[in-house]
Amino acid sequence: KLFTDKRKAEELIKKRQDFVNSVYMVGSSCLDLDYLNLDILKYIDIEELTPQVYVRSDRLYGACCNSAEYGDVSNCSADDLLADFLSKADAALEDGSRRAADLRFGHDTGLMPLMGLMGVNELAVQYNMVGAHEHWFTYDVVPMGSNFQMIFYRNKKGNVLVKMLYNEQE
């Protein structure tokens, strides 16, 4: 779909899969840039696009989630972050504290290990890295703008309760 002269394209492109991978990477990035109004992925056949999506999901799952191969290592990368959350929550709950909120901003690659460590939803389940796409896709589980909220409050008895929301879902 990208070339009008198929023979010339085959002559210029020595490694077809590498080329498709490069077009996929650029096309994926363009989807995040609305002002470009550019959809490069429409030029890739679905048969070539689908394996790209599978491989990307598998790799990201293996590197950042609770995969059978690397989950313990990935989850440990969130130890300090969780400890920081809990210490700030403890400080906010102390008598006389005026702290109402702590906001943190990060990236999906920081959120995924934290959710695995805490045992939250799909990110707590262990799959093998290869084939993880059969169970979940990155864009479904950790879409752009993903968020995690821990809301601490006291009930009428004075007990501390925590409401946790992942992408606005309890």
Predicted regions: what they are:
Residues K1-D102, G106-E170:
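Signature for phosphate-centric chemistry
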